[in-house]
Swiss-Prot record:
GO MF entries: rRNA binding; structural constituent of ribosome
Gene Ontology annotations for the cellular component aspect, listed alphabetically: cytoplasm; small ribosomal subunit
Record function comment: Binds 16S rRNA, required for the assembly of 30S particles and may also be responsible for determining the conformation of the 16S rRNA at the A site.
Record text on subunit structure and interactions: Part of the 30S ribosomal subunit. Contacts proteins S3 and S10.
Signal peptide span: none
Pfam family, one: Ribosomal_S14
Biological process according to GO: translation
Keywords for this protein: Ribonucleoprotein, Ribosomal protein, RNA-binding, rRNA-binding
Species of provenance: Erythrobacter litoralis (strain HTCC2594)
Protein name: Small ribosomal subunit protein uS14
Keyword Chloroplast recorded: no
InterPro entries from the UniProt entry: Ribosomal_uS14, Ribosomal_uS14_bac/plastid
Protein family: Belongs to the universal ribosomal protein uS14 family.
């Protein structure tokens, strides 16, 4: 089990990303638009710098839904490899079977 503070910090970041997503995307589009004047693009970049760092989507870490483990995460299931194996062996994940050939 991961530290509760790490899990809570990541949840807070997810909330911030969601809150600032529209504003961030709009400013990013303006900053990357080559057809606009350089001063407009600079202003957009300065406004982007005012947005909190934790509102950047790259700072969010994928974590297991059950344990909070940050490594070995499977996006399709939302859990880590260890939980995937345990739940798969118990038959709790529909359609997941042990391979045999």
């Amino acid at each position: 089990m991961a530290k509760l503070s790490s899990i809570n910090k990541n949840e807070k970041r997810k909330k911030l990303v969601k809150q600032y997503a529209a504003k961030y995307e709009k400013l990013k589009a303006i900053a990357n638009d080559k057809s606009l004047d350089e001063t407009e693009r600079l202003i957009a970049r300065l406004k982007m710098a005012e947005i909190p760092r934790n509102a950047n989507p790259t700072r969010v870490r994928n974590r297991c839904a059950t344990t909070g483990r940050p490594r070995g995460y499977y996006r399709k299931f939302g859990i880590n490899r260890i939980e995937l194996r345990d739940l798969g062996n118990k038959g709790l994940i529909p359609g997941l079977t042990k391979s045999s050939w």
